[in-house]
């Protein structure tokens, strides 16, 4: 990377041009004017990055386009590790679930966990991949303190699955639309350990609990063009592994980790630009923001004639500064010196084995979205219901008990979702059952209770459980649908509010809502609102 030094004549001030931006190092106390100039330079640099970020987000007005691919590591929810019988549980005491095999002791031999192969085939099929009937393991060799063997067991030239794709629907707030992103390969490998750094930074410790834990790496084609598309791709993969039950997909626990490759090129150019890998993104929102920043950084360098400063490297996303920083220069495949793993045989799969797994596959998110869409639900409803497998199951079960699809979706997306958000609960943690939600919807639809009373009953059922019928009976909540009874209440309210009635006659017709509210109050919310408005309208018209 080019380095330009600018030295002041009297004061040893060193200014460095890095990535097209000025950074100033003060070697001795300066006069305030030099400090002001340095701050102004930094402010101008920060402003230029912000402007470039905004421009990059509006790709249509740019002369550059981004090319984005993602490598996703999914930690499998197997009982034991990939090549030994050690269990793994997130948060365990450091180095408490290890053995000579996963610690890399001499003379130990790996034994493949058959469940890892099953999970790999499941995910490969879900990603519409070609499953290899014969694949093999390889040694990926590199040195790092958390890699006890000095190599990682992975798959190199013959992965277990390849040439697939992932379909998804973008959220409505991001423009909507269907997308299909290619999947280059899915391969099996083992995880490394973890370094624990001291607060002072003076030393690090190694926890090998995670060493040997099975992973699936999913490599996408460079088909994405925006941070939003990449984030939604990652979110769809998370949904997929959760639907399949192969992983919990929790990014906070490291069960799903995304490394993003980003490059930019002039629109219309077929050759790829120099790609940069970004790590350390712990949420899908962070993925989107990191990519948008990196796109803006690279476009800025191109516009300033410094494209040669974009080098193949690994950069870390820093959440506090909302920027990426150089971590290391990117290694090439030759640096890993791959060669076949001599201690493991080839993985040979029969067509019967693959078919058996195919036939046991659950309904996947894409198929579920299309089914919900065919029910006449809006795309917003479809995405909300299908994005969480537990919510989708609750919705389907409610329909099985006879509820109308649109009404059930409205209740789940409205009052139930609001309660879950406020209480920080998932839908499988509440006491309301799909049967009782369908009963509640039916009770409102047939006029037994009003919608207002229905909301009150819903909250009680969510928090305490029980049945709709018992709550209605215990609290005497049956809707008043007798016209004579409602008429009597309307007459009483009009008689009790002569001043408002006179104002209504003078043209303040909005007071009809006031009278309706008073009747509902007198009936404790049980008056049939349709019948009430009809009778009230007739009475007010007669009194005008």
UniProtKB/Swiss-Prot annotation:
The protein's Enzyme Commission number: 6.3.5.-
Statement: the UniProt record of this protein carries the keyword Mitochondrion: yes
A single GO molecular function term of this UniProt record: glutaminyl-tRNA synthase (glutamine-hydrolyzing) activity
Annotated GO CC locations: chloroplast; glutamyl-tRNA(Gln) amidotransferase complex; mitochondrion
Pfam families linked to this entry: GatB_N (PF02934), GatB_Yqey (PF02637)
SMART domains assigned: GatB_Yqey (SM00845)
Keywords recorded for this protein, A-Z: ATP-binding, Chloroplast, Ligase, Mitochondrion, Nucleotide-binding, Plastid, Protein biosynthesis
Electron transport recorded as keyword: no
Cell location: Mitochondrion; Plastid, Chloroplast
Catalytic activity: L-glutamyl-tRNA(Gln) + L-glutamine + ATP + H2O = L-glutaminyl-tRNA(Gln) + L-glutamate + ADP + phosphate + H(+)
GO biological process: glutaminyl-tRNAGln biosynthesis via transamidation; mitochondrial translation
EC category: ligase
Xref: InterPro entries: Asn/Gln-tRNA_amidoTrfase_suB/E, Asn/Gln-tRNA_Trfase_suB/E_cat, Asn/Gln_amidotransferase, Asn/Gln_tRNA_amidoTrase-B-like, GatB, GatB_C_1, GatB_Yqey_C_2, Gln-tRNA_amidoTrfase_suB_CS
Protein family according to the UniProt entry: Belongs to the GatB/GatE family. GatB subfamily.
Further details from the record: This protein may be expected to contain an N-terminal transit peptide but none has been predicted.
Subunit structure: Subunit of the heterotrimeric GatCAB amidotransferase (AdT) complex, composed of A, B and C subunits.
Physiological role: Allows the formation of correctly charged Gln-tRNA(Gln) through the transamidation of misacylated Glu-tRNA(Gln) in chloroplasts and mitochondria. The reaction takes place in the presence of glutamine and ATP through an activated gamma-phospho-Glu-tRNA(Gln).
NCBIfam families: gatB (TIGR00133), PRK05477.1-2 (NF004012), PRK05477.1-4 (NF004014)
Name of the protein in its database record: Glutamyl-tRNA(Gln) amidotransferase subunit B, chloroplastic/mitochondrial
